[in-house]
């Protein structure tokens, strides 16, 4: 939780507020793969057990290698967790029964890996008793009254602190330059840093320089960042699988852009249409594939950059679409 405790506190304060009887208690954390969203919402939920004495329910809406949970399946799963018997009901009846139960109890529902607003809406109740905390893979802009927070890479100081917490002060300070290299090779992503720290802590005979050397190979980096069932590659793969074809295909044309880019670069590589290029840039940002890196030299046009883990995965782990190297139409 290096650098994230203020956000944890804000989430807890919002979800436990009772001063407004019409206040919808919904909080959404959005960010790219590896940004630590799951750990963040679990930490926030852990401190709210007393506020929701009727229970906390955790649901992974899109587990690895599985189809996303439909709204109806989610409703029935939460109903079962609350002791309901939804089997005989149709979707509308089951949804109404769930909302009634949530309005009469103090329950916190925690949803991980949300892909769409439709997965969340069935749980929203105009009542302050229950609350919903969501980790989302993309913007859920259509959800009403949400308390939204974006997370991404850690600041450099927080990233170094996270690695130091996992590996130990003595080791990181004895190899400061190697520690800095590891932090940057991990793109300061909490998941990548966590895996790197576990790799080192379970190998006390290996140096940070050894790890930095392994991570320096960009083609193998994302595959190497795996310990047990924790994998940066798997995290990014889940995002990539959810991308529609009209987003995934152009993404392959942008992966060799290591720096920032804007409308002109997209028009040169993907489409001659300025409107299409602008819409694509919006969609990539909306889906947490890119982040805003600044504005142009004239202070005007927005500049973007691919999230490093997304770029590495797209470049080295999945084949490009047919005709990738053909000129853009």
What is each PLM-predicted segment?
Residues 114-123, 144-146:
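Conserved ATPase-coupling elements of RecA-like P-loop NTPase cores
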Residues 199-247:
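Loop-to-helix "switch" segment enriched in basic
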Residues 1-112, 128-136, 147-153, 159, ...:
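Walker A/P-loop phosphate-binding element recognition
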Residues 212-219, 223-227, 308-312, 317-318, ...:
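Amphipathic helix-loop-helix modules that constitute alpha-helical solenoid scaffolds
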Residues 123, 152-194, 279:
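Amphipathic alpha-helical segments of the small helical/lid subdomains adjacent to P-loop NTPase cores
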Residues 113-114, 135-139, 197-198, 308:
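A short beta-strand-to-loop transition that corresponds to the Sensor-1 phosphate-sensing loop
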Residues 180-184, 191-202, 237, 252-253, ...:
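C-terminal helical "lid" of AAA+/P-loop NTPase domains
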Residues 42, 134, 175-179, 241-324:
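C-terminal boundary/linker of central alpha/beta nucleotide-binding cores
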């Amino acid at each position: 939780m290096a650098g994230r405790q203020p956000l944890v506190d804000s989430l807890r304060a919002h979800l436990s507020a009772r001063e407004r009887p019409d206040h919808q208690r919904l909080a959404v954390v959005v960010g790219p793969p590896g940004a630590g969203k799951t750990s963040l919402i679990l930490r926030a939920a852990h401190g709210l057990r007393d506020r929701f004495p009727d229970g906390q329910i955790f649901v992974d809406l899109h587990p690895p290698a599985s189809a996303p949970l439909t709204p109806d399946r989610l409703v029935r799963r939460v109903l079962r967790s609350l002791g309901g018997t939804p089997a005989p009901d149709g979707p509308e009846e089951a949804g109404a029964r769930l909302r009634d139960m949530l309005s009469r109890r103090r329950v916190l529902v925690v949803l991980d890996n949300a892909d769409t607003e439709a997965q969340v809406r069935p749980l929203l109740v105009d009542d302050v008793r229950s609350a919903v905390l969501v980790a989302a893979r993309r913007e859920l802009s259509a959800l009403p009254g949400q308390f939204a927070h974006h997370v991404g890479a850690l600041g450099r100081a927080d990233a170094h602190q996270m690695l130091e917490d996992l590996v130990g002060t003595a080791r990181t300070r004895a190899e400061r330059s190697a520690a800095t290299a590891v932090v940057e090779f991990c793109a300061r992503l909490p998941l990548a840093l966590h895996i790197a720290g576990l790799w080192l802590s379970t190998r006390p005979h290996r140096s940070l320089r050894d790890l930095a050397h392994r991570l320096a190979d960009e083609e193998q980096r994302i595959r190497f960042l795996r310990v047990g069932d924790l994998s940066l590659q798997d995290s990014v793969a889940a995002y990539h699988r959810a991308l529609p074809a009209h987003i995934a295909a152009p993404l392959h044309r942008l992966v060799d852009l290591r720096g920032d880019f804007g409308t002109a670069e997209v028009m040169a590589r993907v489409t001659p249409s300025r409107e299409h290029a602008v819409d694509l840039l919006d969609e990539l940002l909306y889906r947490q594939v890119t982040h805003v890196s600044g504005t142009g030299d004239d202070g005007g046009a927005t500049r973007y950059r691919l999230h490093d883990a997304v770029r590495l995965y797209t470049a080295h782990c999945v084949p490009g679409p047919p005709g990738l190297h053909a000129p853009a139409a």
